[in-house]
Amino acid sequence: MDILLYFTVHWGAMTDLANKQKPRWGKKFKDKRHWPSTNELYVVRGMYFLDLDWVENWDVELEEMNRGKVGHPYEFPESLIQLQGLWKAKNIPYRMIEGITRQLFNIAGLPAYNNYTTVCRRINRLDVQIRLPEGTVIELTFEDGTGFQAINGGEYLREKYGKKNRMWVQVVMLGDPKTKEPVGFEVNLVPSSEPESAIRQLENMIEQNIEVKGFGSDGAMDDKRLWNACDEYGINAVIKPDKDARSDGESPQRNWNVKYRNKHGYDKWAKKVGYGMRWPATEGIFSAIKRIFGEQLLARSDVGLVQEAGLKVWAYHRLKHGVVG
Protein backbone atom coordinates (compact mmCIF):
# COMPACT_ATOMS: atom_id res chain seq x y z
CA MET A 1 0.00 0.00 0.00
CA ASP A 2 2.83 2.39 0.93
CA ILE A 3 4.61 1.58 -2.32
CA LEU A 4 1.45 2.22 -4.32
CA LEU A 5 0.88 5.54 -2.53
CA TYR A 6 4.50 6.59 -3.10
CA PHE A 7 4.29 5.68 -6.77
CA THR A 8 1.00 7.52 -7.22
CA VAL A 9 2.16 10.71 -5.50
CA HIS A 10 5.57 10.90 -7.14
CA TRP A 11 4.38 9.81 -10.57
CA GLY A 12 1.78 12.57 -10.42
CA ALA A 13 4.45 15.08 -9.43
CA MET A 14 6.72 13.97 -12.28
CA THR A 15 3.85 14.20 -14.72
CA ASP A 16 3.10 17.77 -13.60
CA LEU A 17 6.77 18.69 -13.98
CA ALA A 18 6.87 17.19 -17.46
CA ASN A 19 3.81 19.18 -18.44
CA LYS A 20 5.35 22.39 -17.14
CA GLN A 21 8.52 21.77 -19.16
CA LYS A 22 6.60 21.54 -22.42
CA PRO A 23 7.14 24.56 -24.68
CA ARG A 24 4.36 27.13 -24.40
CA TRP A 25 2.26 27.92 -27.43
CA GLY A 26 2.16 31.43 -28.85
CA LYS A 27 4.69 34.23 -28.59
CA LYS A 28 7.11 34.27 -25.67
CA PHE A 29 6.05 36.76 -23.02
CA LYS A 30 8.30 39.81 -22.73
CA ASP A 31 8.13 41.64 -19.43
CA LYS A 32 8.39 45.32 -20.36
CA ARG A 33 7.69 46.71 -16.91
CA HIS A 34 10.09 49.26 -15.41
CA TRP A 35 10.87 47.37 -12.23
CA PRO A 36 12.09 50.23 -10.00
CA SER A 37 8.80 52.11 -10.47
CA THR A 38 6.77 48.88 -10.35
CA ASN A 39 8.36 47.87 -7.05
CA GLU A 40 7.68 51.31 -5.60
CA LEU A 41 4.04 51.06 -6.69
CA TYR A 42 3.63 47.82 -4.76
CA VAL A 43 5.35 49.32 -1.70
CA VAL A 44 3.09 52.39 -1.77
CA ARG A 45 0.02 50.15 -1.88
CA GLY A 46 0.99 48.87 1.54
CA MET A 47 0.82 52.42 2.90
CA TYR A 48 -2.91 52.58 2.18
CA PHE A 49 -3.57 49.99 4.87
CA LEU A 50 -2.52 52.61 7.44
CA ASP A 51 -3.49 55.81 5.63
CA LEU A 52 -4.70 58.37 8.19
CA ASP A 53 -4.90 61.53 6.08
CA TRP A 54 -8.68 61.58 6.56
CA VAL A 55 -8.43 61.88 10.37
CA GLU A 56 -8.07 65.68 10.31
CA ASN A 57 -11.61 65.85 8.87
CA TRP A 58 -13.09 63.52 11.51
CA ASP A 59 -15.45 66.09 13.04
CA VAL A 60 -16.42 67.64 9.71
CA GLU A 61 -17.29 64.24 8.24
CA LEU A 62 -19.34 63.26 11.30
CA GLU A 63 -21.24 66.53 11.19
CA GLU A 64 -22.13 65.93 7.55
CA MET A 65 -23.17 62.31 8.22
CA ASN A 66 -25.41 63.29 11.13
CA ARG A 67 -27.12 66.21 9.39
CA GLY A 68 -30.82 65.33 9.29
CA LYS A 69 -30.23 61.88 10.77
CA VAL A 70 -33.03 60.46 12.93
CA GLY A 71 -32.06 58.47 16.01
CA HIS A 72 -28.67 57.96 17.61
CA PRO A 73 -25.97 59.97 15.81
CA TYR A 74 -23.00 58.35 14.15
CA GLU A 75 -19.93 58.31 16.39
CA PHE A 76 -17.40 57.13 13.82
CA PRO A 77 -16.89 58.56 10.32
CA GLU A 78 -17.34 56.46 7.19
CA SER A 79 -13.65 56.92 6.36
CA LEU A 80 -12.70 54.91 9.45
CA ILE A 81 -15.10 52.13 8.44
CA GLN A 82 -13.66 52.11 4.91
CA LEU A 83 -10.15 51.72 6.31
CA GLN A 84 -11.35 48.91 8.57
CA GLY A 85 -13.13 47.38 5.56
CA LEU A 86 -9.77 47.26 3.82
CA TRP A 87 -8.36 45.31 6.77
CA LYS A 88 -11.36 43.00 6.78
CA ALA A 89 -10.80 42.28 3.09
CA LYS A 90 -7.44 40.84 4.23
CA ASN A 91 -9.36 38.39 6.45
CA ILE A 92 -8.38 40.12 9.69
CA PRO A 93 -10.99 39.14 12.32
CA TYR A 94 -13.19 41.87 13.82
CA ARG A 95 -11.64 41.62 17.30
CA MET A 96 -8.18 42.10 15.81
CA ILE A 97 -9.49 45.09 13.85
CA GLU A 98 -10.61 46.60 17.16
CA GLY A 99 -7.12 45.96 18.53
CA ILE A 100 -5.44 47.68 15.58
CA THR A 101 -7.78 50.66 15.93
CA ARG A 102 -7.03 50.89 19.67
CA GLN A 103 -3.32 51.10 18.92
CA LEU A 104 -3.92 53.87 16.38
CA PHE A 105 -5.89 55.66 19.11
CA ASN A 106 -2.94 55.27 21.49
CA ILE A 107 -0.03 56.11 19.20
CA ALA A 108 -1.39 57.93 16.14
CA GLY A 109 -3.86 60.42 17.61
CA LEU A 110 -7.06 58.76 16.40
CA PRO A 111 -9.89 60.66 18.19
CA ALA A 112 -11.72 57.48 19.24
CA TYR A 113 -11.95 53.75 18.51
CA ASN A 114 -14.96 51.50 17.98
CA ASN A 115 -15.48 48.04 19.45
CA TYR A 116 -15.62 44.95 17.27
CA THR A 117 -19.42 44.68 17.29
CA THR A 118 -19.71 48.22 15.93
CA VAL A 119 -17.00 47.44 13.38
CA CYS A 120 -18.92 44.35 12.23
CA ARG A 121 -22.25 46.16 11.98
CA ARG A 122 -20.84 49.14 10.08
CA ILE A 123 -18.73 47.06 7.68
CA ASN A 124 -21.72 44.90 6.82
CA ARG A 125 -23.59 48.12 5.92
CA LEU A 126 -20.71 49.60 3.97
CA ASP A 127 -21.51 50.44 0.35
CA VAL A 128 -18.98 48.37 -1.58
CA GLN A 129 -20.41 48.84 -5.07
CA ILE A 130 -18.01 50.34 -7.60
CA ARG A 131 -19.48 53.67 -8.67
CA LEU A 132 -17.93 55.13 -11.80
CA PRO A 133 -18.26 58.87 -12.46
CA GLU A 134 -21.29 59.84 -14.52
CA GLY A 135 -20.39 60.16 -18.19
CA THR A 136 -17.60 57.57 -18.03
CA VAL A 137 -16.92 55.89 -21.37
CA ILE A 138 -15.88 52.23 -21.28
CA GLU A 139 -14.41 51.19 -24.62
CA LEU A 140 -14.50 47.47 -23.85
CA THR A 141 -15.33 45.38 -20.80
CA PHE A 142 -15.20 41.63 -20.34
CA GLU A 143 -17.25 39.46 -17.97
CA ASP A 144 -16.34 36.37 -16.00
CA GLY A 145 -17.27 34.67 -12.75
CA THR A 146 -15.31 33.12 -9.92
CA GLY A 147 -15.91 31.65 -6.47
CA PHE A 148 -14.75 32.53 -2.96
CA GLN A 149 -14.58 29.74 -0.41
CA ALA A 150 -16.83 30.05 2.65
CA ILE A 151 -14.73 28.11 5.14
CA ASN A 152 -16.85 28.88 8.22
CA GLY A 153 -20.22 29.08 6.54
CA GLY A 154 -19.87 25.95 4.43
CA GLU A 155 -22.08 23.72 6.56
CA TYR A 156 -24.62 26.51 6.88
CA LEU A 157 -24.76 27.01 3.12
CA ARG A 158 -25.09 23.27 2.56
CA GLU A 159 -28.03 23.01 4.95
CA LYS A 160 -29.80 26.12 3.66
CA TYR A 161 -29.17 25.99 -0.08
CA GLY A 162 -28.41 22.35 -0.83
CA LYS A 163 -25.37 20.18 -1.26
CA LYS A 164 -24.49 21.41 -4.75
CA ASN A 165 -23.98 25.00 -3.61
CA ARG A 166 -21.91 24.43 -0.51
CA MET A 167 -18.81 26.36 0.39
CA TRP A 168 -18.56 28.75 -2.58
CA VAL A 169 -19.89 32.28 -3.05
CA GLN A 170 -20.17 33.45 -6.66
CA VAL A 171 -18.79 36.77 -7.90
CA VAL A 172 -19.63 37.88 -11.44
CA MET A 173 -17.38 40.76 -12.50
CA LEU A 174 -16.98 43.16 -15.41
CA GLY A 175 -13.38 44.24 -15.96
CA ASP A 176 -11.57 46.81 -18.09
CA PRO A 177 -8.66 45.30 -20.09
CA LYS A 178 -6.83 48.64 -20.37
CA THR A 179 -6.86 49.69 -16.73
CA LYS A 180 -6.99 46.08 -15.47
CA GLU A 181 -9.61 47.16 -12.93
CA PRO A 182 -13.09 45.91 -12.10
CA VAL A 183 -15.81 48.28 -13.32
CA GLY A 184 -18.72 46.37 -11.79
CA PHE A 185 -19.56 43.16 -9.98
CA GLU A 186 -22.39 41.15 -8.46
CA VAL A 187 -22.24 38.67 -5.56
CA ASN A 188 -24.55 35.65 -5.30
CA LEU A 189 -24.79 33.11 -2.49
CA VAL A 190 -26.42 30.63 -4.84
CA PRO A 191 -24.72 30.57 -8.27
CA SER A 192 -26.99 32.28 -10.77
CA SER A 193 -27.00 32.78 -14.54
CA GLU A 194 -23.91 34.74 -15.60
CA PRO A 195 -25.60 36.10 -18.76
CA GLU A 196 -28.46 37.47 -16.64
CA SER A 197 -25.99 39.00 -14.20
CA ALA A 198 -24.05 40.61 -17.05
CA ILE A 199 -27.25 42.09 -18.51
CA ARG A 200 -28.24 43.52 -15.11
CA GLN A 201 -24.83 45.12 -14.66
CA LEU A 202 -24.79 46.58 -18.17
CA GLU A 203 -28.28 48.02 -17.67
CA ASN A 204 -27.24 49.54 -14.33
CA MET A 205 -24.30 51.26 -16.01
CA ILE A 206 -26.50 52.62 -18.77
CA GLU A 207 -28.97 53.94 -16.17
CA GLN A 208 -26.05 55.75 -14.46
CA ASN A 209 -25.20 57.46 -17.77
CA ILE A 210 -22.09 55.35 -18.32
CA GLU A 211 -21.41 54.57 -21.96
CA VAL A 212 -20.33 50.98 -22.68
CA LYS A 213 -19.06 50.65 -26.23
CA GLY A 214 -18.00 47.01 -26.14
CA PHE A 215 -18.74 43.91 -24.09
CA GLY A 216 -17.12 40.49 -24.29
CA SER A 217 -16.94 37.10 -22.65
CA ASP A 218 -16.03 33.48 -23.26
CA GLY A 219 -18.09 30.81 -24.99
CA ALA A 220 -20.07 30.04 -21.84
CA MET A 221 -21.83 33.38 -22.37
CA ASP A 222 -22.97 32.58 -25.91
CA ASP A 223 -26.55 33.29 -24.89
CA LYS A 224 -29.13 34.87 -27.20
CA ARG A 225 -30.43 37.09 -24.39
CA LEU A 226 -27.00 38.65 -24.00
CA TRP A 227 -26.47 39.08 -27.73
CA ASN A 228 -29.90 40.67 -28.07
CA ALA A 229 -29.18 43.02 -25.15
CA CYS A 230 -25.96 44.16 -26.83
CA ASP A 231 -27.88 44.74 -30.07
CA GLU A 232 -30.55 46.70 -28.21
CA TYR A 233 -28.13 49.01 -26.40
CA GLY A 234 -25.75 49.47 -29.33
CA ILE A 235 -22.90 47.62 -27.61
CA ASN A 236 -20.28 45.88 -29.73
CA ALA A 237 -20.36 42.23 -28.63
CA VAL A 238 -17.08 40.29 -28.39
CA ILE A 239 -18.48 36.94 -27.29
CA LYS A 240 -17.01 33.65 -28.48
CA PRO A 241 -19.74 31.82 -30.44
CA ASP A 242 -20.25 28.10 -29.98
CA LYS A 243 -18.30 26.06 -32.55
CA ASP A 244 -21.56 24.65 -33.95
CA ALA A 245 -23.41 27.97 -33.89
CA ARG A 246 -25.74 28.84 -36.76
CA SER A 247 -25.40 32.12 -38.63
CA ASP A 248 -29.11 32.80 -39.16
CA GLY A 249 -30.22 33.59 -35.61
CA GLU A 250 -31.98 36.61 -34.09
CA SER A 251 -28.87 38.66 -33.38
CA PRO A 252 -27.18 40.37 -36.37
CA GLN A 253 -23.95 40.69 -34.37
CA ARG A 254 -23.86 37.01 -33.51
CA ASN A 255 -24.55 36.05 -37.12
CA TRP A 256 -21.63 38.22 -38.28
CA ASN A 257 -19.26 36.75 -35.67
CA VAL A 258 -20.22 33.18 -36.57
CA LYS A 259 -19.74 33.81 -40.30
CA TYR A 260 -16.38 35.55 -39.82
CA ARG A 261 -15.07 32.86 -37.46
CA ASN A 262 -16.19 30.04 -39.77
CA LYS A 263 -14.66 31.70 -42.82
CA HIS A 264 -11.34 32.92 -41.41
CA GLY A 265 -10.80 30.63 -38.43
CA TYR A 266 -10.73 31.24 -34.69
CA ASP A 267 -7.31 32.94 -34.51
CA LYS A 268 -8.12 35.59 -37.11
CA TRP A 269 -11.55 36.15 -35.58
CA ALA A 270 -10.04 36.61 -32.10
CA LYS A 271 -7.49 39.11 -33.43
CA LYS A 272 -10.12 40.96 -35.44
CA VAL A 273 -12.52 41.53 -32.53
CA GLY A 274 -9.95 41.88 -29.72
CA TYR A 275 -10.96 38.70 -27.91
CA GLY A 276 -7.42 38.29 -26.61
CA MET A 277 -8.02 41.17 -24.18
CA ARG A 278 -10.36 38.97 -22.14
CA TRP A 279 -7.62 37.54 -19.93
CA PRO A 280 -6.27 40.80 -18.39
CA ALA A 281 -9.85 42.02 -17.90
CA THR A 282 -11.06 38.96 -15.99
CA GLU A 283 -8.69 36.19 -14.95
CA GLY A 284 -5.85 38.63 -14.39
CA ILE A 285 -7.97 40.75 -12.04
CA PHE A 286 -9.36 37.74 -10.16
CA SER A 287 -5.83 36.39 -9.75
CA ALA A 288 -4.62 39.71 -8.32
CA ILE A 289 -7.58 39.98 -5.92
CA LYS A 290 -7.04 36.47 -4.60
CA ARG A 291 -3.27 36.93 -4.26
CA ILE A 292 -3.69 40.13 -2.24
CA PHE A 293 -6.86 39.40 -0.26
CA GLY A 294 -7.17 35.60 -0.43
CA GLU A 295 -10.10 33.54 -1.67
CA GLN A 296 -11.44 32.41 1.72
CA LEU A 297 -14.40 33.99 3.50
CA LEU A 298 -14.64 33.88 7.30
CA ALA A 299 -18.25 35.03 7.68
CA ARG A 300 -21.10 32.67 8.61
CA SER A 301 -24.27 34.65 7.85
CA ASP A 302 -25.78 35.41 4.45
CA VAL A 303 -25.14 39.13 4.84
CA GLY A 304 -21.59 38.60 6.04
CA LEU A 305 -20.65 36.23 3.22
CA VAL A 306 -22.02 38.49 0.49
CA GLN A 307 -20.40 41.58 2.01
CA GLU A 308 -17.04 39.91 2.59
CA ALA A 309 -16.82 38.71 -1.02
CA GLY A 310 -17.77 42.17 -2.26
CA LEU A 311 -15.22 43.78 0.06
CA LYS A 312 -12.37 42.00 -1.70
CA VAL A 313 -13.30 43.34 -5.14
CA TRP A 314 -14.08 46.81 -3.73
CA ALA A 315 -10.80 46.93 -1.77
CA TYR A 316 -8.75 45.95 -4.83
CA HIS A 317 -10.39 48.71 -6.86
CA ARG A 318 -9.59 51.27 -4.16
CA LEU A 319 -5.98 50.09 -3.87
CA LYS A 320 -5.56 50.49 -7.61
CA HIS A 321 -6.77 54.08 -7.29
CA GLY A 322 -4.88 54.80 -4.08
CA VAL A 323 -8.09 55.65 -2.23
CA VAL A 324 -8.93 54.77 1.37
CA GLY A 325 -10.85 57.47 3.20
Residue ranges and their predicted role:
Residues M1-W25, G325:
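Intrinsically disordered, low-complexity and often Lys/Arg-enriched segments
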Residues T15-D31, G219-K290:
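Helix-centered, glycine/charged polyanion-binding patches within enzymatic domains
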Residues H34:
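Conserved, mostly hydrophobic/aromatic
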Residues N39-A89:
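Basic, short loop/linker segments at the boundary and entry of helix-turn-helix/winged-helix-like folds
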Residues G68-I92, G99, A112-Y233, S247, ...:
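Polybasic low-complexity intrinsically disordered regions
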Residues L86-A89, D267-G325:
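Basic, amphipathic alpha-helical segments enriched in Lys/Arg and hydrophobic/aromatic residues
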